[in-house]
């Protein structure tokens, strides 16, 4: 596939994912902002509206506005611009799985940055998973996009490490 087509498809995927994130967050604002809690599968999946000014598990909620601006908006934007430049430069060598992974990271990051810019530095969160008292923190699809890629990379590279160990174990020693 031609590099320009890969970049085009990457941009389409990232924009579609950002659009999906925006639509679902707006739906959560419209239907859950009044304090309504919706539960599915015996409380395994819960929808509950929250505004998070911090990061994962609300880390950084108490930061000053200026520090928050740098940590949650400016630095992530710089990272995402670097990521986009990397994809543009390396797209020729990338397969579609890597491109989709980078599109998920870009969409997840941009989804939350858009929230922070539009809604006075807070992100709309609305999903919780768990059984009984063992529950996740509250999150959104942008968080899920990035988390999916991180977990996939960890599993992929763990598998590669295991393969390398097997290959080196089968090599004759000198």
Where are these regions (language model features)?
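Alpha-helical transmembrane bundles and membrane-interface segments of multipass inner-membrane proteins
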Residues: 1-174
């Amino acid at each position: 596939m031609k590099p320009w087509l890969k970049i085009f498809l990457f941009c389409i995927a990232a924009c579609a994912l950002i659009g999906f994130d925006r639509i679902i967050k707006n739906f959560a604002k419209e239907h859950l902002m009044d304090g309504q809690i919706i539960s599915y599968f015996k409380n395994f999946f819960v929808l509950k509206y929250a505004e998070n000014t911090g990061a994962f598990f609300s880390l950084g909620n108490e930061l000053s506005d200026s520090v928050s601006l740098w940590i949650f908006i400016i630095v992530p934007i710089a990272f995402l611009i670097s990521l986009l430049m990397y994809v543009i430069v390396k797209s020729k060598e990338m397969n579609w799985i890597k491109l989709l992974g980078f599109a998920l990271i870009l969409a997840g990051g941009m989804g939350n940055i858009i929230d922070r810019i539009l809604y006075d530095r807070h992100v709309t969160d609305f999903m919780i998973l768990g059984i009984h008292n063992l529950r996740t923190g509250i999150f959104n699809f942008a968080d899920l996009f990035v988390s999916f890629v991180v977990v996939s990379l960890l599993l992929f590279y763990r598998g590669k490490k295991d393969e390398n160990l097997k290959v080196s174990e089968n090599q004759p020693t000198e």
